[in-house]
Amino acid sequence: MIKLLKAGLLALVLPMAATSFAADYQEGVHYDVIAERATKKPEVKEFFSFYCPACNNYESLISEFKPKLDKNVKFKKSHVDFVGVRNPENQQMMSQALATAEVLPQKEKLIAAIFNHIHTKRAKFNELADVKDVFVAQGVDGDKFDKLFKSFSVRTLSSKMKRDQEYFKEKGALRGVPTFIVNGKYKLNLGRESGVTAPEDISKLINYLANK
């Protein structure tokens, strides 16, 4: 009897706790609604640039909150071409480098190596050969890199990054990086003003919006 009573009370308390937790999130404080329609599948997309110091610093934070995302929430990266003094063509090359990394098993290592090349080694990517060198250093066959970088699938993904960039810039949602957008509909407001700074808090907010 006691066990049944406890189970009944728990069943009542859990929905109330979940509702209370969700009610803590406020539009305009913790997130902004930037579109009417949401993506068909739950996702969070980070708009970033390899040239952005803040994006580089965020990598460690992402590595902490990403594992805490619900299994149905996919984390995606999208490279932009409007950061710093680098010309758009060079930055677009880096978008294509990300797209190439996306189809390789060493993806995470490659992304980390590119950030490290720019922000730790203080080295430059002046031409495609520089990008290739980083990929080869991470175990990617040189010929395979050449084929993948020019492949239709990689060019298509890179083009989509550009389209997404322009779309969200027009919406007024993408003014700087890093910017996180959930389901193509909600822009996260991270920082002191919203109080969402810790990895656990970020993952909870993403999960809430992704399943909203």
Regions of interest found by a model, annotated:
Residues 89-93, 97, 107, 126-156:
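Conserved segment of the thioredoxin-like fold in thiol-based oxidoreductases
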Residues 57-129:
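Structural alpha/beta surface segment adjacent to cysteine/selenocysteine redox centers
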Residues 41, 94, 176-177:
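A structure-centric signal for secondary-structure junctions around beta-strands
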Residues 2-86, 162, 166-171, 205-212:
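Extracytoplasmic thiol/disulfide redox context detector
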Residues 5, 93-103, 107, 186, ...:
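Conserved short hydrophobic patches within well-ordered secondary structure
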Residues 51, 66-69, 101-105, 114, ...:
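Sec/Tat-exported extracytoplasmic proteins
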Residues 6-9, 25-31, 93-99, 128-133:
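Short acidic/polar alpha-helix capping motifs at helix-coil junctions
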Residues 49, 137-212:
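C-terminal cap of thioredoxin/glutaredoxin-like
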